[in-house]
Amino acid sequence: MPSTSIAEFREVLRNAKNIIAVAGAGLSAASGIPTFRGAGGMWRKYDAMSLATPEGFADNPSLVWQFYHYRREAALKADVNAAHLALASFSIPRIRHTVAPGSSFTLITQNVDGLSPRAMKCVLQGWDGVTLPEDPPYLIEMHGRLFDVKCTQCDHVELDTSSPICEGLAGTEKLVEQAVLDPEIPEENLPRCKKCGSLARPGVVWFGEMPHDLPLIDTLVEKADLCLVVGTSSTVYPAAGYASEVSANGGKVAVFNYERTMGDDDADFLFLGGCEETLPKALGLPDKPASEGAPASSL
């Protein structure tokens, strides 16, 4: 039976040296980003295979782009929540070392909403000259980003946070909310590659495609002695297997989820409830870890 003791968790945290967090849709639920597989998941009305596969895009790029335009608009309107901010703060060595001295940390997120990097900007705002460690990286977005636009022909990738991304999709997010999609938007009116002019696609990792940075992730998972599972039901591989691999290697696993899932079997600690409440409380980070004038080299 997993422990629910914050004191015991903090003792493990204090002694951990190589920490990873594996995050899923539940991390962003409190920000108003709909989850896919929960009871209220927005995919309940649609076939996921028709919306999140290369084959689905080839069959109906208009339908797929309307769906991802809806997700882009939702992400642009969303605010980061306390769990995003806690993980961002924990990524900064000076802050993290107050509760986990001498440790490294990487957040491996399955989310594509861009809220984790936005949270880091919020945490770092006003800190002149602060830099984050590059080895290991503080964040890996293994399933890509909603705001990356990838060419279907030349593979050019470009960050585009414009709203709407193109005039042909303007207002269609309201149709998605009503579960009425218009499949008749001409292909020439969908997003195009700014380099070669060909049809572009959302720059996310679809089912059947290879997630980003797998060799690096495998190395981090193999070294990890503590894995935080945050807002994920541990059903999508390879991420679903990371916690069990850490556990098999002798590391500890702490799960922060709204409700119990199959992934709890590997947990040493289980904190149920919204992770925007449970995670900051469990980490116990100081409110103000350093002065405004702290030298960048110490961070």
Swiss-Prot record:
Keywords: Metal-binding, Mitochondrion, NAD, Transferase, Zinc. NAD(+) binds at residues 24-43, 110-113, 231-233, 257-259, 275. Pfam families: SIR2. Residues 1-299 form the Deacetylase sirtuin-type domain. The active site is at H143. InterPro entries: DHS-like_NAD/FAD-binding_dom, NAD-dep_sirtuin_deacylases, Sirtuin, Sirtuin_cat_small_dom_sf, Sirtuin_class_III, Ssirtuin_cat_dom. Binds 1 zinc ion per subunit. It comes from the Eukaryota. Its cofactor is Zn(2+). GO terms for cellular component: mitochondrion; nucleus. Substrate binds at Y68, R71. Its EC number is 2.3.1.-. The keyword Mitochondrion applies. It catalyses: N(6)-malonyl-L-lysyl-[protein] + NAD(+) + H2O = 2''-O-malonyl-ADP-D-ribose + nicotinamide + L-lysyl-[protein]; N(6)-succinyl-L-lysyl-[protein] + NAD(+) + H2O = 2''-O-succinyl-ADP-D-ribose + nicotinamide + L-lysyl-[protein]; N(6)-glutaryl-L-lysyl-[protein] + NAD(+) + H2O = 2''-O-glutaryl-ADP-D-ribose + nicotinamide + L-lysyl-[protein]. Zn(2+) binds at C151, C154, C193, C196. GO terms for molecular function: histone deacetylase activity, NAD-dependent; NAD+ binding; protein-glutaryllysine deglutarylase activity; protein-malonyllysine demalonylase activity; protein-succinyllysine desuccinylase activity; zinc ion binding. It is found in: Mitochondrion. HAMAP family: Sirtuin_ClassIII. In contrast to class I sirtuins, class III sirtuins have only weak deacetylase activity. Difference in substrate specificity is probably due to a larger hydrophobic pocket with 2 residues (Tyr-68 and Arg-71) that bind to malonylated and succinylated substrates and define the specificity. Belongs to the sirtuin family. Class III subfamily. This protein may be expected to contain an N-terminal transit peptide but none has been predicted. NAD-dependent lysine demalonylase, desuccinylase and deglutarylase that specifically removes malonyl, succinyl and glutaryl groups on target proteins. Has weak NAD-dependent protein deacetylase activity; however this activity may not be physiologically relevant in vivo. This is NAD-dependent protein deacylase. It comes from Coprinopsis cinerea (strain Okayama-7 / 130 / ATCC MYA-4618 / FGSC 9003).
